[in-house]
Design a protein with these regions (language model features):
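A secondary-structure boundary/capping signal
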Residues: 25, 92-93, 122-125, 190-191, ...
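Conserved N-terminal catalytic core of the sugar/cofactor nucleotidyltransferase
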Residues: 4-92, 97-104, 111
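Conserved core of the sugar-phosphate nucleotidyltransferase
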Residues: 99-188
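Conserved alpha/beta core of the MobA/IspD/sugar-nucleotide pyrophosphorylase nucleotidyltransferase superfamily
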Residues: 144-145, 151, 159-274
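A short acidic, often aromatic-flanked loop/helix-cap motif at beta-alpha or helix-coil junctions
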Residues: 54-59, 127-129, 157-159, 242-244
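Short, high-confidence coil segments that cap the C-terminus of an alpha-helix
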Residues: 18, 85, 116-117, 231-232
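Conserved beta-strand scaffold positions in the cores of enzyme catalytic domains, especially
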Residues: 47-49, 119-121, 234-236, 243
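Short, surface-exposed amphipathic charged segments that create phosphate/polyanion-binding patches used
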Residues: 58-70, 134-139, 250-254
């Protein structure tokens, strides 16, 4: 995608009050990344780079010779444990989340956290994450007393002929989702104690899956474990931001037009970083 969603996320994060950006990349990409990406942020924000590699495992574990796939999104978070010292948000670099999403999570992270396991996530309204060009997969959330109760990955969410949002459940029955149903788009808020929990859960993951070449340690699965054990609560934050990206090639013209509109109406300057 020629549109750099990452640049918009960095810009929006700065506007929301975040003061440092930590990028998780492959070591072999470092030189190009510093020249082509980090250079544009100089003078605008404090940036750091950490490296995710398949050999970055806890003491006592050795990466299998046939492993080529990264260990997953929650393993990527663990790469920042020696760099991050305060509350932090986690995003997908190639997603566009919108200004309001960063505003609400920055507000939540800036309050006092006086206990471990006090986390948050932005719950996007599923109707604001859809495409007209096919189906999508989303982590559909149930919320209890303002906190995350469950998150279930639903595949093939789409519009039906009446433009209702539907998916087929595990029993083969078509179910309808209300447009304001919260879904996770991997915009999470944590405090540094999450590294401790993640390290423990990653070791458990490796004990079961280290010899499975395509197994991955995902953020939602780790969070779900902590919620079910009572070690964490995850406040679900509402946003009216519209997530968008190029899920299908047919999405591209609409996304390009939307970015042009956001520049034209003054949401973003002509150049984000100059």
């Amino acid at each position: 995608m020629c549109i750099r969603d990452r640049d918009y996320s960095v810009y929006d994060a700065l506007q929301a009050g975040f003061g440092k950006i930590v990028f998780v990349i492959r070591k072999d990409f470092e030189d190009d990344f510093r020249k082509k990406v980090l250079s544009k942020y100089e003078g605008h924000v404090d940036v750091d780079v950490v490296f995710q590699s398949i050999d970055a495992l806890p003491e006592g574990y050795t990466c299998p010779a046939d492993r080529t796939k990264p260990w997953g999104t929650n393993h990527a978070i663990l790469m920042g444990k020696d760099t991050i010292t305060g509350p932090f948000a986690v995003i997908n670099a190639d997603d566009f989340y919108g200004r309001d999403a960063f505003r609400v999570i920055a507000g939540e992270l800036s309050r006092t956290h006086d206990r471990k396991g006090d986390y948050c996530m932005v719950g996007f309204r599923v109707g604001n994450t859809m495409t007209e060009n096919g189906s999508v997969s989303r982590g559909v959330c149930t919320v209890k007393d303002g906190n995350l109760d469950t998150v279930v990955e639903r595949t093939a969410i789409s519009f039906d002929k009446d433009h209702n949002i539907v998916f087929t459940d595990e029993n083969g029955t078509q179910q309808q989702l209300q447009p304001n149903t919260p879904v996770s788009m991997n915009l999470w808020g944590f405090t540094p104690d999450y590294f401790e929990y993640s390290g423990r859960e990653f070791r458990k993951f490796l004990d079961k899956n280290i010899d499975t070449p395509k197994s991955e340690f995902y953020i939602p699965s780790c969070v779900d474990t902590l919620v079910k054990s009572g070690e964490a609560t995850v406040k679900v934050l509402d946003t009216d931001s519209r997530w968008f990206g190029v899920t299908y090639a047919e999405d591209r013209p609409g996304v390009v037009a939307k970015f042009a509109e956001l520049h034209a109406n003054g949401t973003y300057p002509a150049k984000l970083f100059q």
